[in-house]
Amino acid sequence: MDSEKILNAVKEARTLAKPRNFTQSVDLIVNLKELDLSRPENRLKEQIVLPSGRGKDVAIAVIAKGDLAAQAEDMGLTVIRQEELEELGKNKKTAKKIANAHGFFIAQADMMPLVGKSLGPVLGPRGKMPQPVPANANLAPLVARFQKTVAINTRDKALFQVYIGTESMSDDELAANAEAILNVVSKKYEKGLYHVKNAFTKLTMGAAAPIEK
């Protein structure tokens, strides 16, 4: 899709949303076509680094113990220790709240079997299974990358809606993020963007603005 048409859709989305007393998010909505999504190879499951960043921090939880847990605490991240992890396995309601409140999860590699048992049934369907790291990992580079990343997981649905930033970002920044996501879609399929039926940009409380093909 043409960069200028993506930019025009971002600008139109702003005009379709009334001012609110909070900073609205901006999403890209994409409808796919002519894909057999019962076949796993046709599904989109991607983590995409946004060239303009997210515009606001995303909550990250670290499942760890010892030095890695201490490092995560010093960084102001949510820390889930082994005893808490075991409790979450028994309390699905609390586990769901934690899953919904965090964009990404990181787990100490030797805790992954327990993570799979305790949180796997909650995180798996949400496409949020943790990134495993060794006990002596430096979390800073991974956290920095996640703060610029969005995740797409279509499963068997021919539609996805993904965050591309906030209304406080410039039109050019938002358009660059939307284009980066559409480029991933284009590279995924042999026929590229032919498989995009239509695409829109939208603010939280606004109507969707179509991206002209």
From Swiss-Prot:
Part of the 50S ribosomal subunit. NCBIfam families: PRK04203.1. It comes from Methanococcus maripaludis (strain DSM 14266 / JCM 13030 / NBRC 101832 / S2 / LL). This is Large ribosomal subunit protein uL1. InterPro entries: Ribosomal_uL1 (IPR002143), Ribosomal_uL1-like (IPR023674), Ribosomal_uL1/biogenesis (IPR028364), Ribosomal_uL1_3-a/b-sand (IPR016095), Ribosomal_uL1_arc (IPR023669), Ribosomal_uL1_CS (IPR023673). CDD domains: Ribosomal_L1. PANTHER family: 54S RIBOSOMAL PROTEIN L1, MITOCHONDRIAL, LARGE RIBOSOMAL SUBUNIT PROTEIN UL1M. Binds directly to 23S rRNA. Probably involved in E site tRNA release. Protein L1 is also a translational repressor protein, it controls the translation of its operon by binding to its mRNA. Belongs to the universal ribosomal protein uL1 family. GO terms for molecular function: rRNA binding; structural constituent of ribosome; tRNA binding. Signal peptide: none annotated. GO terms for biological process: regulation of translation; translation. Keywords: Repressor, Ribonucleoprotein, Ribosomal protein, RNA-binding, rRNA-binding, Translation regulation, tRNA-binding. GO terms for cellular component: large ribosomal subunit. It comes from the Archaea.
